[in-house]
Amino acid sequence: MNKIISVWKKMNLIRKIGIGVVLGVLLGLIAPKITVIALFGSLFVGALKAIAPLLVLTLVAHALSQAPAGQKSNMRTVICLYLFGTFAAAFIAVGASYLFPIKLVLSTTTTTDITPPQGIAEVFQDLLLKVVDNPINALATANYIGVLTWAAVFGLAFRHASKTTKDLLQSTAEVISKVVGWIIGLAPFGIMGLVFDTIANNGLTALKDYGLLLLLLVGSMIFVALVVNPLIAFLVMKKNPYPLVFECLRVSGVTAFFTRSSAANIPVNMQLCKRLGVDPDTYSVSIPLGATINMAGAAITINILTMAAVHTLGISVDFSSALLLSVVASLSAAGASGVAGGSLLLIPVACSLFVVPYVV
């Protein structure tokens, strides 16, 4: 028994999740009436929902409070490229969802009371009201747009605080990130419960659309990595970007894939920049900053899963709303930085634009 526990601890999270998926499918087919297994999924999702608002508030506030002022002039270009790259990825995700719309099987029956917003004006009005929500109420009701807004305000205010106060904010962010890490560590059991619930209630056919959803996610990310990012690099460098792109993917991409955390990948990226001869004064700031605001993968995940929910519920999305969704996803993706799988916690931010019920 101890040997099994030891092997389990040494196994990476992706393999554990894979085992959880397989067990969920098998148990859903063999013993669909043991509904207590589905409780693992409910507890896992509940824990994520509970910690997510605090996670967003502390990480964004801490990132903004630590952002140094008066950097070299080329940092403006770097920041603009970060923001443009994230927005482009978000917009491509929306376009991919239009081309390949996916509808998912939901276990909830609360979709009949949905009142979709009537165009961009109503969406924008609702967005503004969420922005000025009471910060305590925003945390309690999981109003992520309000949480992001107040996190940005507090973060800017904390720039002028004492070092002791900033250290306290950093420690708070680290503690909450640690708690999130513990919850994410339980993902194999939670996903096993979620898969079991899906299979037990809907059968194997329910996995078809989730497989298509995964293909759409991966395809969009590959397109951004091999087409959009090289195009941006070409416009800046005026030369073939692919040798640099493939080198970065080889060194940094593999680590990023298995850690699923931009913060965890910072040391790898800094070593790569040093080896490539990049100015230390630039990459010492641009790499940590990019781990916060250059969140193309998170933006893709947020938008594709949001559009899947929207298509499932039959809500129409016009071009203006899609554009606003891309902007909101780009901004909210910053809240996913530093946490493995953190983008999944930010999906309600985008879904709230279209009055998608939180239970979905």
UniProtKB/Swiss-Prot annotation:
The keyword Cell cycle does not apply. Pfam families: SDF. It is found in: Cell membrane. Keywords: Amino-acid transport, Cell membrane, Membrane, Symport, Transmembrane, Transmembrane helix, Transport. Belongs to the dicarboxylate/amino acid:cation symporter (DAACS) (TC 2.A.23) family. HAMAP family: Ser_Thr_transp_SstT. This is Serine/threonine transporter SstT. It comes from Streptococcus suis (strain 05ZYH33). The gene is sstT.
